[in-house]
């Protein structure tokens, strides 16, 4: 890799570190090519990405970025899993680590907050952005349906009373 390619890689990594909601650092020593492709596919399906980069270049790219706290984790054979959704990359990494003993989560960063392996696991258990939006939308819709039910209740009560009176009159 010549100097221009290294500078380009540092720029790309810098953009990734700035735009990612979460970055997870893991060791991947011993994974086969097929296993790495599986990890990449899972990350892509979840809206994230996986990147293997030279630790030295990644540390340079981290300088001045919000997630610079992960620089200490970049030792040995490391892989970066990242996504704009703060939960997606953590879920992918955590699920893959449960299935494959060779994939070991070292930690990560969520914005300026450094995460250890337990922190990444905690983030992975959080609901995704879409799930949170659906929950909030459901909560916002509930009062409207309650109001509609309360408004409609007197009319249905009157209808049932009239029905009862009609049944008694017919009998």
UniProtKB/Swiss-Prot annotation:
Task: Quote the gene name from the UniProt entry.
Answer: rplJ
- Please give the function described in this protein's UniProt entry: Forms part of the ribosomal stalk, playing a central role in the interaction of the ribosome with GTP-bound translation factors.
> Sorted alphabetically, which PANTHER family does this protein's record hold?
39S RIBOSOMAL PROTEIN L10, MITOCHONDRIAL
Q: Which UniProt keywords apply?
A: Ribonucleoprotein, Ribosomal protein, RNA-binding, rRNA-binding
Report the record's Gene Ontology biological process terms: translation
What protein name is recorded for this chain? Large ribosomal subunit protein uL10
SUPFAM superfamilies associated with the record: Ribosomal protein L10-like (SSF160369)
Instruction: Pull one GO CC term from this UniProt entry.
Output: large ribosomal subunit
Q: Which GO terms describe its molecular function?
A: large ribosomal subunit rRNA binding; structural constituent of ribosome
Query: InterPro entries recorded for this chain?
Result: Ribosomal_uL10, Ribosomal_uL10-like_sf, Ribosomal_uL10_bac, Ribosomal_uL10_bac_type, Ribosomal_uL10_CS_bac
Similarity-based family: Belongs to the universal ribosomal protein uL10 family.
Query: Which Gene3D superfamilies did the record assign?
Result: 3.30.70.1730, 6.10.250.290
Reply yes or no: does the keyword Ribonucleoprotein apply: yes
Its assembly, as annotated, is:
Part of the ribosomal stalk of the 50S ribosomal subunit. The N-terminus interacts with L11 and the large rRNA to form the base of the stalk. The C-terminus forms an elongated spine to which L12 dimers bind in a sequential fashion forming a multimeric L10(L12)X complex.
Q: Which organism is it from?
A: Roseobacter denitrificans (strain ATCC 33942 / OCh 114)
Q: Which domain of life is it from?
A: Bacteria
């Amino acid at each position: 890799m010549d100097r221009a390619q290294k500078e380009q890689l540092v720029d790309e990594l810098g953009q990734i570190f700035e735009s990612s909601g979460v970055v997870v650092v893991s060791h991947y020593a011993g994974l086969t090519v097929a296993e790495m492709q599986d990890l990449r596919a899972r990350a892509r399906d979840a809206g994230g990405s996986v990147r293997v980069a030279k630790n030295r270049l990644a540390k340079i790219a981290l300088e001045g970025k919000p997630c610079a706290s992960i620089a200490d984790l970049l030792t040995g054979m490391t892989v970066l899993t990242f996504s704009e959704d703060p939960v997606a990359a953590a879920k992918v990494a955590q699920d893959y680590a449960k299935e494959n003993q060779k994939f070991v989560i070292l930690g990560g960063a969520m914005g300026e907050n450094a995460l250890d392996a337990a922190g990444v696991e905690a983030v992975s258990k959080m609901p995704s952005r879409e799930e949170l939006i659906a929950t909030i939308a459901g909560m916002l819709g509930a009062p409207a349906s309650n109001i509609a039910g309360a408004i409609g209740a007197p009319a249905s009560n009157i209808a049932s009373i009239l029905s009862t009176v009609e049944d008694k009159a017919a009998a």
